[in-house]
Amino acid sequence: MTAFRLAVENGYGMEFDLHLLKDGNLGVMHDSLLNRTTGQAGRIEDLTTEDLKNYRLENTEDTIPRFADVLTLVDGKVPLIIELKPEDGNHAKLSETACNMLKGYKGVYCIESFDPRCIAWLRKNRPDIIRGQLSENFFRDRTDLSDTLKFLLTHNLANFLCRPDFIAYKFADRNSTPSNWLCRRLWRVQGVSWTLRSKEDHDTALKEGWLSIFEGFRP
């Protein structure tokens, strides 16, 4: 929670990832696997809400937060970009649970996901929520997907089903597909670049018309 608290204190919006826990609640962590962030084996999807307090993050006193705790802390003070990270086909349940928890929340927020099924769910069930499709050049890093799926996701070909309000594309890959240009220029879909780690990249993204998701510096 320290990073979220500092973001609020400095007036920065924040982006974070949601996972569906074993008991149906939501936990906030980047990876499904626990080892990189906590040093312990397992998946966050196999934990309960009570379990979260037993997993310390990056050798700090912070433990894995609940989504409810983050909403209480922020309390509408800064905007939120909420990423849904489904596992094992739980995209619909994850999307529904997140939206239910956001009912009554007074702050500014949007929801994004790499999984087009989450974005399609939002379009059908909560079209009032700003939704974004996350993407990158999947041919560069991903070995767990078929070439067909890599092609579809890299070139934003699910967008005709999802109709995202914005596309959040990896900064280094932003010129990998003409679909980014088409979506932004012809259909006026806002482009967002992630994750920017220098002021130079931040300035370049803004100059090219991309909004910025950044870390590690003050723009």
What are the roles of these predicted feature ranges?
Residues 1-219:
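Phosphate-group recognition and catalysis centered on beta-loop-alpha active-site segments
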